[in-house]
UniProtKB/Swiss-Prot annotation:
It comes from the Viruses. Belongs to the P2likevirus baseplate hub protein family. Pfam families: Phage_GPD. Residues 233-275 are annotated as: Disordered. It is found in: Virion. Putative baseplate hub protein. Keywords: Late protein, Viral baseplate protein, Viral tail protein, Virion. One of its GO terms (cellular component) is virus tail, baseplate. This is Probable baseplate hub protein. Homotrimer. Residues 240-254, 263-272 have a biased composition (Basic residues).
Amino acid sequence: MLDALTFDAGSTLTPDYMLMLDSRDITGNISDRLMSMTLTDNRGFEADQLDIELNDADGQVGLPVRGAVLTVYIGWKGFALVCKGKFTVDEVEHRGAPDVVTIRARSADFRGTLNSRREGSWHDTTLGAIVKAIATRNRLEASVAPSLAGIKIPHIDQSQESDAKFLTRLAERNGGEVSVKMGKLLFLKAGQGVTASGKKIPQVTITRSDGDRHHFAIADRGAYTGVTAKWLHTKDPKPQKQKVKLKRKKKEKHLRALEHPKAKPVRQKKAPKVPEAREGEYMAGEADNVFALTTVYATKAQAMRAAQAKWDKLQRGVAEFSISLATGRADIYTETPVKVSGFKRVIDEQDWTITKVTHFLNNSGFTTSLELEVRLSDVEYETEDDE
């Protein structure tokens, strides 16, 4: 958005916003009192958060009712404002002196049904069907990534567990990310740079001149080298055991400076066709320093998905990068793929995914801070069965 804007040389960009309370525009009521507005766009089921600080030196600011809905738009004067969603007020603070009112609102109403404990079981269904059913009973619209929607779920229990926690557990097992944004329950493929409908998110390019601060760190090389998951089922009465290893297939690009020494590509090897074992263990990576998932899964397929999801998460965390943009970018969201330039080669050559966006706005400025992780592009796997 902003990198495509043109404005007169020497002109000054002025931050702008619009705030609506239950569909009523209250921008004019607070414009002279606004001290700061902070909007945090989080990945996953950590709700997006809106913090507004208002000057109440004269004691005339009315405290909003918890449960009220705020809709916020931010950007720059002279350009179209970007809607950042609806937020439910769940905290109000008053402090002094000088007196200040802080209003805190979140994208999902965690005082509502999403956070209520439930009992239930799901049989012979799919991941997409479960997500849609939960969305419906929470008055949300479901949007599930096609690659996840068709995953078969033979049986799973929801015992004294909120829908929020249950969905998070499903996401962790199947390599997804779940969140609530703009009245939609989103179930995405984690770190792939695609929307819930499967469309690719346009890549954003950020140069060093766009920011005024950055931080880069490579994780400990002695971290986990693999993940194991166990399964146990009774379809085959034979007391067979099977151990399955997961390794990455070779791909054209993989930044060696960020590549774990135990995550190197290997030659493709076809596994012999054998009946699925009644019980077994599945390993992603190498056995030197293994993270063992404690859950025992019902099938080999479930164990494989869980191990792959955890292994991918560990690989995405091999490096971290953050940057503060001096000129705010209201058009940037989490899961957006990013290429950067002007930094060290090891940073510039890596593909990145945004995991957190923080917009800070007041009457004199608008900045955006980004947190990014390594993007796993077009990752494919091969398996080896050890009898």
